[in-house]
Amino acid sequence: MPLSYQHFRRLLLLDDEAGPLEEELPRLADEGLNRHVAEELNLGNLNVSIPWTHKVGNFTGLYSSTVPVFNPHWKTPSFPNIHLHQDIIKKCEQFVGPLTVNEKRRLQLIMPARFYPKVTKYLPLDKGIKPYYPEHLVNHYFQTRHYLHTLWKAGVLYKRETTHSASFCGSPYSWEQELQHGAESFHQQSSGILSRPPVGSSLQSKHCKSRLGLQSQQGLLARRQQGRSWSIRAGIHPTARRPFGVEPSGSGHTTNLASKSASCLHQSPVRKATYPSVSTFEKHSSSGHAVELHNLPPNSARSQSERPVSPCWWLQFRNSKPCSDYCLSHIVNLLEDWGPCAEHGEHHIRIPRTPARVTGGVFLVDKNPHNTEESRLVVDFSQFSRGNHRVSWPKFAVPNLQSLTNLLSSNLSWLSLDVSAAFYHLPLHPAAMPHLLVGSSGLSRYVARLSSDSRIFNHQHGTMQNLHDSCSRNLYVSLLLLYQTFGRKLHLYSHPIILGFRKIPMGVGLSPFLLAQFTSAICSVVRRAFPHCLAFSYMDDVVLGAKTVHHLESLFTAVTNFLLSLGIHLNPNKTKRWGYSLHFMGYVIGCYGSLPQDHIIQKIKECFRKLPVNRPIDWKVCQRIVGLLGFAAPFTQCGYPALMPLYACIQSKQAFTFSPTYKAFLCKQYLNLYPVARQRPGLCQVFADATPTGWGLVMGHQRMRGTFQAPLPIHTAELLAACFARSRSGANILGTDNSVVLSRKYTSFPWLLGCAANWILRGTSFVYVPSALNPADDPSRGRLGLSRPLLRLPFRPTTGRTSLYADSPSVPSHLPDRVHFASPLHVAWRPP
């Protein structure tokens, strides 16, 4: 007869009518019994002949591909003009007095952040935008380009102008080195950064030269020039001689020196009024003149006799005959003025040599499962986390559940702040730009690469007969719809572009580390400025707690103003006031302790409702089930040990079959959740110790000992002794000299013992006692005669590595005394 659920509960000593613990508990360590129970519950039978189940509820397993859903109406989120103040350390010191070593070190780490990969692999521009939605290629291309353009406008990205220069929008930092022209630097501002000169300025020609990549004194192009005379004359009509250079085709050939600027040379005269400062060549093009380059080398892209070809793929359609009803020339002729071929930022800086390549692909997805209206850019820089040259990212402290509860479980009022686009606050050094490149090869190549199997030869699409190869009904219809959304930006977005990150990107393992350092330093400063409140953060989630609601509101105003003064952008719509139960990191934390949030409890109920019995479930599904149940395991009677059979099946990559008893056991475990309570400081007065053959306890002045029927492994014996001490004395602080018991991880013990011990020792705090000083050492060896003096061992609750108490150094006298708002507390209250 199979083991029933009631019998199994009794076996695990979860019922009250169990016999004396000293007899019952050691039986659970018996290997034979564990094996027998595993067979009864069908836990060990991993080799099954029935086909595996690959889907349970929302959990999918092996061989299932979830098709990503493209939303043609995605809104691109707007990014505030985020600029974190460069003198953030000075501002914090004005606010709170001298910073501690830890705070200073952490803030220096991100001002600016640096990124040093060992090896960087460059990919062709075609791989810039991933064909993630094969059905919606063109739509996805333009949405992604628009997202990248938005980020560039918000100062998050640099735009590669030439191999050694980049432009960006927003306020410059001092480490962004101005663009030099030869030895003299031009248009120097007080900040030492080059801003764009006005169009009519005398620096125009110099600026054009530097755009053409001619920094001759730096020897960049000295070898290529070989004494050619380059001059810029404004007296020659563009039809007289075609300027040299075609649009870079994305194939990476940057030998045509003028290629980057050629896109600006042909612009309709209409644009004079509309774009006074967009193009560097405005002065010439608007008056119908162009840059002339003398003495073209004989091997130039085309001979002089050839008729001039406009370098812009998009605008070429204007002069060509429509090839069909769905020819792109119909769309290009919709507008007289399509705007500039390229936009340039407000500032130009020097950058290390950056090739015309990308180092990671991008694509769009839903912002989050609850918000499918807006899109989110996914950047794949996984090359830095893979292979022999992978970068090992720095580790940082993630607060565990007990530490969080010790810190935050109190009778405070709470609110949480939302930092908008938290990653994009932290500036990156320009030296990192060549490693973090995204971009695209332009619409013509993107469409050609995906629509035809033929190889695209370099510059092939520059000729007229190949121009119409890309015309198709699908492309025509897509562009017509997109024209309603983007208007004349279609032209701008159809050009190739290469962008490097100016702020830390999300797809690199360094970023979460830096963000965690940054927010923890800021919270540390806030805690010291307001000693009677609690500020805590994990990544971009910042919470504030205070004794009363009025106090919390004034604190909220003060902290918000402080954060805004540092240049940190908060999202006021997402500020949440929680009352006395804080919702943080998936938990609800109140004065009683912590519990999982409601939506997680609902997911668990749903999971058990859909869980099939007596059917082999694919280990990938088990992995997902364990992920969900593991989060709530600390709140159950038996904790993680109850999930051990599932862990074993995942490790051996076999299917797992839930027997009705095991499912009922887990179901009952997860339907009654117990809060994880805050640990309290106290004195340890109960000690336990064991040898393989016996155990001993000391409770105050009372001492006990006992023996095991058969010798046990030492860790098992120590665990049993701790369980006896807890059940005999009822004390919730125990002294032990065994590090495994101290760690409270009971997953390596025999399965039944681990489950039972977890319930007996739930809520117990352990203090380490060296063996030589442990008063229970003698009783465990069978000697009751000698009594050692009782130790007074204090227990301090741990807050893990999330150190809170940075003691405030004395504030220098020249700072005025801060006026405290009427505090409901007479004494400065310290967090628990």
From Swiss-Prot:
Family membership: Belongs to the hepadnaviridae P protein family.
Additional note from the record: Hepadnaviral virions contain probably just one P protein molecule per particle.
Function: Multifunctional enzyme that converts the viral RNA genome into dsDNA in viral cytoplasmic capsids. This enzyme displays a DNA polymerase activity that can copy either DNA or RNA templates, and a ribonuclease H (RNase H) activity that cleaves the RNA strand of RNA-DNA heteroduplexes in a partially processive 3'- to 5'-endonucleasic mode. Neo-synthesized pregenomic RNA (pgRNA) are encapsidated together with the P protein, and reverse-transcribed inside the nucleocapsid.
Domain Reverse transcriptase: 346-589
Residues reported in the UniProt entry to bind Mg(2+): D418, D540, D541
Species classification: Viruses, Riboviria, Pararnavirae, Artverviricota, Revtraviricetes
Protein's UniProt name: Protein P
Signal sequence region: none
Residue segments, region Terminal protein domain (TP): 1-177
E.C. designation(s): 2.7.7.7, 2.7.7.49, 3.1.26.4
Matching Pfam families: DNA_pol_viral_C (PF00336), DNA_pol_viral_N (PF00242), RVT_1 (PF00078)
